[in-house]
């Protein structure tokens, strides 16, 4: 029997009001709510913790981890302006989506 899996790629930032000075961190996880909570607690990646990347700006769901990892790699190769454009198209107000994700834990 096939088992459904859940994987997410996500972008977190340290600011949601100043795109110019914000840091963007891209990651992949199999439990988005747990990972966002870890970022907020400072136990996420060293880079994200150092720059206080706690605000979730964007995420995508995948069933296959290989697809999620490939997409993560693709986004990491994008220019900063292209990443910002992706966020602006789907989250133009740069609202922190983490509260919604954590609420649905």
Where does each model-flagged region fall?
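A common structural junction motif
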Residues: 77-80
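GIY-YIG nuclease catalytic motif and its immediate N-terminal context
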Residues: 1-45, 49-61, 66-73, 86, ...
